[in-house]
Amino acid sequence: VDVVRMPDASLPLKLSAVRAICNIKMDRAEATGSDDAAVLEHFTTLLPVATHSTLVLLLDTLEAFIPRDKSSSLSLDVLQRMTEAILLSWRHHMSDPAIELSISYVLESLLKCPVPGCPAQTLYMSMQAFAPCLSVDVELGVAPSAAAMIRSVFRVADAEMLRDVVSFAFPAVASYMLVGEDVEALQSLMQSLAILCEKCPHDILGWHDEHDTPSLQILLRIIERLLCMDEQVCGQAFGKFLVALFAQAGSMLAPVMPALLHALVAKLAQATMPDCTLTLLYALAYLMAHHAEAVVAQLAATELEGGESALVTFVRRWLADVLYTTTPDMLQEHMTALMQLFQHWTPSLQHLFVDGDVLPAPDHVIMTRSRAKAYQQYEQIPASTKVLKLLLQEYATSRKLLDEAHARDVQAKAPLEEQLDHDEWSDEDDVDLGLDINWADFQDEEEEGDVMDEADVREALRAVGIADVPSGIRTRRDVDRVRRTHCLAQFLRSLDARVPYVGEAVSHLNATERACLSSL
């Protein structure tokens, strides 16, 4: 600290001292003790004259000084002056991604700071700085940077704090989304709106502007505009925003549901980009999962430009692309929606045929390079069969993973002399000593943060009627898989082959799928 304050010390020496302070402070928070306020004040005064990597280093050091517990002696005034200086640095260096990222880390730490009043003060000051920058009249790059920072602070701020800024944050966000063209800014703001809908739904949906226009009407205008824009706007952020709004608005959407469904399916019919397609399918699947009867009836009665019903168009695209969904939460929603669709099957879907299993190549044909590059040929099967295939496939996959987890748990609990070791030295297929081991470590670390204790597992499964808890269930992902497997098994057991469309669906299953269904 003395080196940093020395007027005749060289710049490299001062930077080395700052880096040492940062490293020590991150490792031992009590290192500087009562000097924290003085050091923070000194570093804060350096922010306006620092640039590039030097500014990043200073920001990282300031972040290390932010209190992590209530024993800190730092006053709210010191943290306020630091926040002001940081926000001023953002305004001057928003074009530098590294500086922008460091500033977001500091603001997130301030939002978690236990000093009384610091989180609320940080959120208010941040929104006062970012909200005016959401404009089409500002310099290029200002709006997307402000939108990204708003998303960052919204993600960390708790619901109580967000309620206090809805009245001036929502108008700024909505105003830009109704006229802005920057894709990056729009995607960040869609995520911000999704966070507001999840954390403070009553405040966001109960807001009215000066003309007494309800926020829901403004949100619907935003959705309408986004659906009319390029497909790259309608990515994952758009899907999360839609589902968050659908989940919180509920029956408030009933008057506009016909127009909303028509707009979503019309966009889906024209979509060519995978992100846009999967996003629209996810939003429609959510509505199908929670409002199946109304959604099926409305889509069946809606005719698109080509004369085809919206229900047929939606189901055709859905069954073709649903397997590309990789997120567990989204996959759960799709499986629930497919079960609901099967239970509300309509005559308009009886004559819909889609791609089934891949047809084998003829034995008598020589496989040339051009034939090898040709598209695979698929068996055409009824749509009802494809739905049943997807549900059986998901059940079989989940059941296999649960059985493997149970087997590992049983072996781990067995006495050492009874544990299987015959394959201790056997080679494993497709293992790369660099990539695969690192990926396995990454997966382990990812799951460790989601571990549940035995009581929580039992409680979560008992809530859905599962009394017999399988062994080896330790993570939230495992619990979700058990729930999904249980629901799929109940649904598949309830099928009655005497119902015409059910009988037709079962008749086109292959031998493996029929065996799986019979085992239930």
Name what the model sees in each region:
Residues 1-520:
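Karyopherin-beta/Importin-beta family HEAT-repeat alpha-solenoid scaffold
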